[in-house]
Amino acid sequence: MPKPDSEAGTAFIQTQQLHAAMADTFLEHMCRLDIDSAPITARNTGIICTIGPASRSVEMLKEMIKSGMNVARLNFSHGTHEYHAETIKNVRAATESFASDPILYRPVAVALDTKGPEIRTGLIKGSGTAEVELKKGATLKITLDNAYMEKCDENILWLDYKNICKVVEVGSKIYVDDGLISLQVKEKGADYLVTEVENGGSLGSKKGVNLPGAAVDLPAVSEKDIQDLKFGVEQDVDMVFASFIRKAADVHEVRKVLGEKGKNIKIISKIENHEGVRRFDEILEASDGIMVARGDLGIEIPAEKVFLAQKMMIGRCNRAGKPVICATQMLESMIKKPRPTRAEGSDVANAVLDGADCIMLSGETAKGDYPLEAVRMQHLIAREAEAAVFHRLLFEELARASSQSTDPLEAMAMGSVEASYKCLAAALIVLTESGRSAHQVARYRPRAPIIAVTRNPQTARQAHLYRGIFPVLCKDAVLDAWAEDVDLRVNLAMNVGKARGFFKKGDVVIVLTGWRPGSGFTNTMRVVPVP
């Protein structure tokens, strides 16, 4: 039964799907899930929106922030630096328009998505808009001869990857335009391949090419990427989504380009091919987080295996305590329709159940007809899915996975999450400078939201990458007396939590603080009733 309005602020955090959360077995947990369980106020999963023509005005961005956008993604495969600079300016203007109210202010992060080392076809008949029809069974010659760079047609196709003849074999497959067109290699020469069209269709200019299974030796960071990354450092972006990462060395190269000035930018590696999946552990070790980029991945590995790769990557990221983003086609049909398909709803929910920290929208918000509806839909689905996570089992397993650690901060984080379960805390309040304390708490996946109070704007923005962290930016001057300064920040978190309906007077919250100034000393845990 719905609660009367007078109790609208009631903390549903502890009670949503509580019966299921306390089950002894996973089967019993599934049996107890209840569609009438009232949803919580807080959503713990981050929502990343790609900003494009449909969403780059300040007014639209304001509405998207209100609807739940946490991170704005700029896709550098398209657009000039001037175009992106204006988008970044608009995102910041939209974010700052809420700054007058510190309680409702939400820091929004900016992410730069690199184009990465791609292989592309040439121009069809010298025009960017011309198309030719490739018929099934027809013969198509692939050439490296630059004379054909702008003269491709249905008989001959130029590619910009010089080593293609070395890395593909007779019998190999070549996919063009997101896998819509497939070719099989019949014969190879020094600078050409003869292929047969297996799946035809109309082919436009400058389309992407995939070579599944081939050991492509393109540089990890292209010349364009270097310029884009330097632009990102100048624009003070918060994170980089690095495309087509195949090995740890690729991540180090991105890090090198970002340099000293960009050393605090988080690098999220996009796994988009077989080699990236195979060498996942070394990539994870070198990265700040991972994106499961299902688009290209679904061409490079068989479509029916993508879900295996998704579960494996999310599992390993959860075990390592690093953020993971699930992306591509999450609500694809909402580009043209106001409601998602049932399959898409399940896909978003299952990404959350798998353990994704963030879920991403691409075309839905960049060029779709219903950008706001797509953000709201992801918000609603994620909120329901989070409550259906079997937290009891998950916490036990995460605690067991890190039982070897002797890091005091990790012990504090684990203890605070365990305490939050035991006393049904409505939230965990963490005071953090670098963000590390909050990240460690998030690692153990508490049911309750983590309100992370920081004075560092970048720490606040980057916190959205981690599930369950609600960053609160404290703009008050530091008080001389440390204890008073701690109280100031804890009270700010209490006010934010009450205003957002996370908890009400009399609820219990867990407070994690340091006992002296500086980063790296979070070592005091208190269980505090909300005043």
Curated annotation (Swiss-Prot):
The entry marks the following residues as binding substrate, namely 73, 270, 295-296, 328
Q: What class of enzyme is it?
A: transferase
Map out region (Intersubunit contact) in residue numbers: 389-433
What residues bear N6,N6,N6-trimethyllysine in this entry?
Answer: 3
Binding residue positions for Mg(2+): 272, 296
Where does this protein act, in terms of pathway?
Carbohydrate degradation; glycolysis; pyruvate from D-glyceraldehyde 3-phosphate: step 5/5
Q: Where is this cross-link: Glycyl lysine isopeptide (Lys-Gly) (interchain with G-Cter in SUMO1)?
A: 166
Q: So where does ATP get bound? A: 75-78, 120, 207
PTM N6-acetyllysine: list the residues. Answer: 62, 89, 166, 266, 270, 305, 322, 475
MF (Gene Ontology)? ADP binding; ATP binding; identical protein binding; magnesium ion binding; mRNA binding; potassium ion binding; protein dimerization activity; protein tyrosine kinase activity
- Which residues does the record list as Phosphothreonine (modified residue)? 41, 195
* Gene Ontology biological-process entries: animal organ regeneration; canonical glycolysis; cellular response to insulin stimulus; glucose metabolic process; glycolytic process; liver development; positive regulation of cytoplasmic translation; positive regulation of sprouting angiogenesis
InterPro entries documented for this protein:
Pyr_Knase, Pyrv/PenolPyrv_kinase-like_dom, Pyrv_kinase-like_dom_sf, Pyrv_Knase-like_insert_dom_sf, Pyrv_Knase_AS, Pyrv_Knase_brl, Pyrv_Knase_C, Pyrv_Knase_C_sf
Q: For this protein, what post-translational modification is recorded in UniProt?
A: ISGylated. Under hypoxia, hydroxylated by EGLN3.
Q: What is this protein called?
A: Pyruvate kinase PKM
Q: What is the lineage of its organism?
A: Eukaryota, Metazoa, Chordata, Craniata, Vertebrata
